[in-house]
Amino acid sequence: MNFDNAHEGIKKLIIAQYLGLFAAAAGLLSIFLTMSMSSALNASAGLKAALGAGGGALVFMLATGGLGIASIVLTIIGLVKAKSDEMNFQTALTFTIAGLGCTIASNLFGSVPVLPGLFNLGSTVCSLFSTIFIVRAIINLSETMGEMGMVKSGQLLCKIIFIAKAAAVGISILTNFFPFLYSISILNFIISTTSVAIEIVVYLLFLRDLIAGRDMLG
């Protein structure tokens, strides 16, 4: 069978995942540089050292935001293209748009108590289901094409991603509803780096599945 739309859509999803991976890496670097700035100030290492670390952190923060936006846009474009070949891509598109809406709402209502936390949590949950439904779409296409090895690896990936994203949801709850944890610098660092590390692992696993799906359909 011919799944040209899914093939083209998945190619765009792969580019989106690369951008998302670079965004996560930039976010991780910004965390380390922010901690370096804080350490420089606390240790009286000098204003120049602190400003250098702070400037670097700002650059990587901006890179994280820009790459993240580009990744979401390409994801939506890819899913719009692929959805005509497999209905799970349509479901993933719905969750992706809902997650984007939650992110925008979180920024719009940033000064309102509780609401930003709820919207951030909603965005994380939407990301979980969007990823799962994309993997499910590739599983269904693999089954149609008789690629049972891809079916089994996709089913395993669904479980791994669900566990990893569930951990991300737990971290989202901690950071959004127990903000006092951020007043403890070491906990702030551990929570932030763990969250980004989980995100990077999911990106890599998901990217591997997308590439396999593209090659199968190509």
Residue ranges and their predicted role:
Residues 23-71, 102-127, 165-199:
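Membrane-helix interface segments in multi-pass membrane proteins
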Residues 1-33, 70-107, 122-171, 196-218:
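Membrane-interface extramembranous regions at the lipid-water interface
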